Regions:
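Phosphate/NTP-binding elements of NTP-utilizing enzymes
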Residues: 1-219
Length: 219
Protein backbone atom coordinates (compact mmCIF):
# COMPACT_ATOMS: atom_id res chain seq x y z
CA UNK A 1 0.00 0.00 0.00
CA UNK A 2 1.68 3.16 -1.25
CA UNK A 3 0.94 6.86 -0.85
CA UNK A 4 2.92 8.51 -3.67
CA UNK A 5 3.18 12.29 -3.52
CA UNK A 6 4.86 14.10 -6.40
CA UNK A 7 4.71 17.59 -7.92
CA UNK A 8 2.49 18.20 -10.91
CA UNK A 9 3.47 17.11 -14.42
CA UNK A 10 6.31 14.76 -13.52
CA UNK A 11 4.67 11.45 -14.49
CA UNK A 12 3.06 10.09 -11.33
CA UNK A 13 -0.20 9.22 -13.10
CA UNK A 14 1.61 7.76 -16.11
CA UNK A 15 3.77 5.63 -13.80
CA UNK A 16 0.66 4.18 -12.19
CA UNK A 17 -0.95 3.56 -15.58
CA UNK A 18 2.11 1.64 -16.77
CA UNK A 19 2.14 -0.46 -13.60
CA UNK A 20 -1.52 -1.38 -13.92
CA UNK A 21 -1.25 -2.08 -17.65
CA UNK A 22 1.58 -4.52 -16.94
CA UNK A 23 -0.46 -6.28 -14.26
CA UNK A 24 -3.56 -6.28 -16.47
CA UNK A 25 -1.77 -7.89 -19.41
CA UNK A 26 0.96 -9.99 -17.81
CA UNK A 27 1.22 -9.80 -14.02
CA UNK A 28 -1.91 -11.52 -12.75
CA UNK A 29 -5.05 -13.44 -13.68
CA UNK A 30 -8.68 -12.99 -12.68
CA UNK A 31 -7.84 -9.83 -10.75
CA UNK A 32 -10.05 -6.77 -10.37
CA UNK A 33 -8.33 -3.40 -10.68
CA UNK A 34 -10.36 -0.30 -9.88
CA UNK A 35 -9.61 3.32 -10.76
CA UNK A 36 -10.95 6.06 -8.50
CA UNK A 37 -10.61 9.81 -9.09
CA UNK A 38 -12.20 13.05 -7.96
CA UNK A 39 -14.85 12.66 -10.68
CA UNK A 40 -16.02 9.97 -13.09
CA UNK A 41 -14.75 11.88 -16.10
CA UNK A 42 -11.19 11.72 -14.79
CA UNK A 43 -11.53 8.01 -13.92
CA UNK A 44 -12.64 7.34 -17.50
CA UNK A 45 -9.74 9.41 -18.83
CA UNK A 46 -7.29 7.27 -16.86
CA UNK A 47 -8.86 4.13 -18.32
CA UNK A 48 -8.70 5.61 -21.81
CA UNK A 49 -5.03 6.44 -21.26
CA UNK A 50 -4.47 2.82 -20.22
CA UNK A 51 -5.93 1.72 -23.56
CA UNK A 52 -3.75 4.21 -25.42
CA UNK A 53 -0.63 2.89 -23.70
CA UNK A 54 -1.69 -0.67 -24.55
CA UNK A 55 -2.11 0.33 -28.20
CA UNK A 56 1.52 1.48 -28.25
CA UNK A 57 2.68 -2.07 -27.55
CA UNK A 58 3.50 -4.47 -30.41
CA UNK A 59 0.28 -6.20 -31.56
CA UNK A 60 1.32 -9.54 -30.07
CA UNK A 61 1.59 -7.95 -26.59
CA UNK A 62 -1.63 -5.92 -26.64
CA UNK A 63 -4.06 -8.76 -25.83
CA UNK A 64 -6.89 -6.63 -27.19
CA UNK A 65 -8.90 -9.38 -28.88
CA UNK A 66 -12.64 -8.84 -28.90
CA UNK A 67 -13.54 -12.40 -27.88
CA UNK A 68 -12.33 -14.96 -25.35
CA UNK A 69 -13.10 -18.57 -24.46
CA UNK A 70 -14.88 -18.84 -21.10
CA UNK A 71 -15.98 -22.28 -19.85
CA UNK A 72 -15.54 -23.62 -23.35
CA UNK A 73 -17.73 -20.96 -24.93
CA UNK A 74 -16.85 -17.95 -27.04
CA UNK A 75 -17.61 -14.76 -25.13
CA UNK A 76 -17.29 -11.11 -26.07
CA UNK A 77 -15.12 -9.19 -23.61
CA UNK A 78 -16.47 -5.89 -22.24
CA UNK A 79 -14.68 -2.86 -23.63
CA UNK A 80 -16.38 0.38 -22.69
CA UNK A 81 -15.37 3.81 -21.42
CA UNK A 82 -15.90 2.49 -17.87
CA UNK A 83 -14.58 -1.08 -17.99
CA UNK A 84 -12.25 -3.41 -19.87
CA UNK A 85 -11.51 -7.11 -19.48
CA UNK A 86 -8.47 -8.93 -20.78
CA UNK A 87 -9.43 -11.86 -23.05
CA UNK A 88 -6.36 -13.88 -22.04
CA UNK A 89 -5.76 -13.17 -18.33
CA UNK A 90 -9.40 -12.24 -17.60
CA UNK A 91 -8.21 -9.34 -15.46
CA UNK A 92 -10.69 -6.47 -15.22
CA UNK A 93 -10.16 -2.72 -14.89
CA UNK A 94 -13.20 -0.86 -13.57
CA UNK A 95 -13.77 2.84 -12.97
CA UNK A 96 -15.66 4.41 -10.09
CA UNK A 97 -17.44 7.74 -9.84
CA UNK A 98 -16.78 10.21 -7.08
CA UNK A 99 -19.28 10.45 -4.24
CA UNK A 100 -21.66 13.40 -4.28
CA UNK A 101 -22.61 13.00 -0.63
CA UNK A 102 -21.63 11.15 2.54
CA UNK A 103 -24.14 8.34 2.01
CA UNK A 104 -22.83 7.55 -1.47
CA UNK A 105 -19.28 7.75 -0.14
CA UNK A 106 -20.02 5.20 2.58
CA UNK A 107 -21.27 2.71 -0.03
CA UNK A 108 -18.75 3.42 -2.80
CA UNK A 109 -16.36 0.56 -1.93
CA UNK A 110 -18.38 -1.36 0.65
CA UNK A 111 -18.73 -5.05 -0.16
CA UNK A 112 -16.80 -4.83 -3.42
CA UNK A 113 -14.17 -7.42 -4.36
CA UNK A 114 -11.23 -5.30 -5.48
CA UNK A 115 -7.73 -6.76 -5.52
CA UNK A 116 -6.05 -3.50 -6.55
CA UNK A 117 -7.37 0.00 -5.93
CA UNK A 118 -5.80 3.13 -7.39
CA UNK A 119 -6.98 6.50 -6.08
CA UNK A 120 -5.59 9.31 -8.23
CA UNK A 121 -5.52 12.83 -6.74
CA UNK A 122 -6.73 11.41 -3.43
CA UNK A 123 -6.22 14.72 -1.61
CA UNK A 124 -8.96 16.23 -3.81
CA UNK A 125 -11.55 13.42 -3.62
CA UNK A 126 -14.50 14.60 -1.54
CA UNK A 127 -15.46 12.42 1.42
CA UNK A 128 -12.21 10.47 1.11
CA UNK A 129 -12.29 9.78 4.85
CA UNK A 130 -15.70 8.10 4.59
CA UNK A 131 -14.72 6.20 1.45
CA UNK A 132 -11.62 4.86 3.20
CA UNK A 133 -13.13 3.91 6.55
CA UNK A 134 -16.14 2.16 5.03
CA UNK A 135 -14.28 0.49 2.18
CA UNK A 136 -11.23 -0.96 3.91
CA UNK A 137 -12.87 -4.01 5.56
CA UNK A 138 -13.85 -5.44 2.16
CA UNK A 139 -10.57 -4.33 0.57
CA UNK A 140 -8.46 -5.97 3.29
CA UNK A 141 -10.30 -9.26 2.80
CA UNK A 142 -9.67 -9.15 -0.96
CA UNK A 143 -6.02 -8.18 -0.39
CA UNK A 144 -5.46 -11.12 1.98
CA UNK A 145 -7.02 -13.56 -0.47
CA UNK A 146 -4.82 -12.23 -3.29
CA UNK A 147 -1.73 -12.46 -1.07
CA UNK A 148 -2.46 -16.13 -0.34
CA UNK A 149 -2.46 -16.72 -4.10
CA UNK A 150 0.76 -14.71 -4.57
CA UNK A 151 -1.18 -12.27 -6.75
CA UNK A 152 -0.57 -8.50 -6.93
CA UNK A 153 -2.76 -6.58 -4.52
CA UNK A 154 -3.00 -3.35 -2.56
CA UNK A 155 -4.07 0.27 -2.46
CA UNK A 156 -2.02 2.90 -4.29
CA UNK A 157 -2.65 6.60 -3.84
CA UNK A 158 -1.12 9.16 -6.21
CA UNK A 159 -1.65 12.81 -5.51
CA UNK A 160 -0.26 16.28 -5.39
CA UNK A 161 -0.36 17.96 -2.01
CA UNK A 162 -3.87 18.86 -0.91
CA UNK A 163 -5.31 22.09 0.43
CA UNK A 164 -5.31 22.22 4.23
CA UNK A 165 -8.42 24.38 4.32
CA UNK A 166 -10.32 21.53 2.64
CA UNK A 167 -11.53 18.41 4.49
CA UNK A 168 -10.22 16.03 1.83
CA UNK A 169 -6.82 17.73 1.90
CA UNK A 170 -6.68 17.57 5.70
CA UNK A 171 -7.51 13.85 5.72
CA UNK A 172 -4.86 13.10 3.09
CA UNK A 173 -2.34 15.11 5.12
CA UNK A 174 -3.15 13.07 8.25
CA UNK A 175 -2.65 9.86 6.28
CA UNK A 176 0.77 11.10 5.21
CA UNK A 177 1.71 11.95 8.78
CA UNK A 178 0.77 8.46 9.99
CA UNK A 179 2.36 6.54 7.11
CA UNK A 180 5.76 4.86 7.19
CA UNK A 181 8.29 7.05 5.40
CA UNK A 182 10.26 5.51 2.56
CA UNK A 183 14.01 6.04 2.38
CA UNK A 184 16.76 4.71 0.14
CA UNK A 185 18.28 2.58 2.92
CA UNK A 186 15.42 0.16 2.38
CA UNK A 187 17.18 -1.13 -0.72
CA UNK A 188 19.66 -2.85 1.62
CA UNK A 189 16.96 -4.63 3.66
CA UNK A 190 15.69 -8.14 3.16
CA UNK A 191 12.02 -8.58 2.31
CA UNK A 192 11.39 -9.98 5.79
CA UNK A 193 13.04 -7.01 7.50
CA UNK A 194 11.21 -4.57 5.26
CA UNK A 195 7.81 -6.08 6.03
CA UNK A 196 8.55 -6.11 9.75
CA UNK A 197 9.40 -2.41 9.56
CA UNK A 198 6.17 -1.58 7.72
CA UNK A 199 3.99 -3.81 9.91
CA UNK A 200 5.42 -2.23 13.07
CA UNK A 201 3.48 0.94 12.25
CA UNK A 202 0.13 0.36 13.95
CA UNK A 203 -1.22 3.71 12.76
CA UNK A 204 -1.09 3.12 9.01
CA UNK A 205 -0.87 0.46 6.31
CA UNK A 206 0.76 2.91 3.89
CA UNK A 207 4.31 3.65 2.84
CA UNK A 208 4.67 7.34 2.02
CA UNK A 209 6.95 8.09 -0.94
CA UNK A 210 7.55 11.74 -1.70
CA UNK A 211 9.93 13.48 -4.08
CA UNK A 212 10.19 17.18 -4.87
CA UNK A 213 11.24 18.85 -8.12
CA UNK A 214 14.85 19.13 -6.96
CA UNK A 215 15.06 15.44 -6.01
CA UNK A 216 13.77 14.54 -9.47
CA UNK A 217 16.41 16.69 -11.13
CA UNK A 218 13.85 19.27 -12.22
CA UNK A 219 14.48 22.02 -9.67
Amino acid sequence: NIFLELPRQVGKTTSALIRYLYIYNFGSANSIITYLHKDMKASKENLNDTKRLRDMLPPYLQMAQEFSIVNGKKKKMPTTVEKIQNPITHNVINTLPSARNAMLASNLLRGKTITMLWADEWAFIKYNDIIYSNGMPALNTAFRNAARNNAPHGFIITTTAGILSDEAGVYAYKMVQNATRFNEQWYDLSYKDLMELIDANVNSIFVHIRFGYDELGLG
